[in-house]
Structures are given as structure tokens and as C-alpha cells.
Regions:
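C-terminal helical cap(s) of enzyme catalytic domains, especially alpha/beta-barrels
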Residues: 87-113
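Alpha-helix-loop-beta-strand connector modules within alpha/beta enzyme cores
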Residues: 36-58, 101-109
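Electropositive phosphate-/nucleotide-binding environments in soluble metabolic enzymes
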Residues: 7, 39, 64, 91-95
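Contiguous, function-dense segments enriched for cysteine-driven chemistry
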Residues: 53, 65, 110-117
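Catalytic cores of alpha/beta
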Residues: 6-16, 58, 62-76
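Histidine/lysine/aspartate-rich catalytic loop segments that bind and position anionic ligands
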Residues: 1-49
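Active-site beta-loop-alpha junctions enriched in small/polar residues
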Residues: 2-6, 26-28, 54-55, 59-65, ...
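Glycine-rich phosphate-binding active-site loops on the catalytic face of alpha/beta enzymes
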Residues: 20-31, 74-94
């Protein structure tokens, strides 16, 4: 279930029996002015999802410049980045695009912020 990163949407997903939610990261990716506040909102939402027993994914607009901070959120289990990877693959090939993204995600998950994974 694709939702906004807030407690009310997560609670509504739980109420209808959803096992997994995907937090919308578009605002974080496209609003450089409000990016820090949006990151805090995503972190809080992911933590709330974990506290109520729902698996948390994230996606929309993620690219090489925005993925690391989202990947470092300990309670996010999966990222959806297909659109960017396919577009980027036009320039460097799909294996290279995936490899670069994987390196960024792996580095973020082993950083102090993502060390709880």
C-alpha cells in the first residue's frame, strides 16, 4: 500500500490488514528546501510502522543523490527505484546503473545511521 509518511496513514493501513506499506519519498526527493524535515518525517513514519508490526518500504523519485539517507533508515526493508535505474541505464547500461545504486545502498546501510539493520 503506497502511503504518505505519517502515523495516521500507517494506522489506517494496519486497520485494513495491510502487511506492508510503501512510504512516498517524492517530497523528500524533489523539495531540497524542506528535505531535512521530510527526512525526519520518513524516519518517524518508518519507526512507527515497525512499532505496530508492519513492514516498511519506500520509494518514488529516489536516485543516486537521494537514496543514501533513505537507505540508512533502519526500519525501511526495501527501496523501489526501478524508474530511475531504467532511465540511467540508457547512459551507462543496466548492470552499471544497478551496481552503482547497490554500492550507495550498501554503504548507507553500514553507516552509523543505518547500522541497526
Amino acid at each position: 500500500m503506497f502511503i504518505e509518511a505519517n502515523q495516521a496513514d500507517i494506522d489506517a493501513a494496519v486497520a485494513i490488514g495491510a502487511d506492508i506499506v510503501e512510504l512516498h519519498t517524492g517530497r523528500y526527493c524533489h523539495d531540497s528546501v524542506g528535505r531535512h524535515d521530510e527526512l525526519l518525517r520518513l524516519q518517524a513514519a518508518a519507526q512507527h510502522a515497525a512499532s505496530v508490526g508492519i513492514e516498511c518500504h519506500a520509494g518514488h523519485g529516489l536516485d543516486y543523490n537521494t537514496v543514501s539517507s533513505i537507505a540508512a533508515i533502519p526500519y525501511i526493508d526495501e527501496l523501489n527505484i526501478g524508474h530511475f535505474l531504467i532511465g540511467e541505464s540508457i547512459f551507462c547500461g543496466l548492470p552499471a546503473a544497478i551496481e552503482k545504486m547497490r554500492q550507495l545502498i550498501d554503504a548507507a546501510c553500514t553507516s552509523p545511521a543505518g547500522a541497526n539493520r
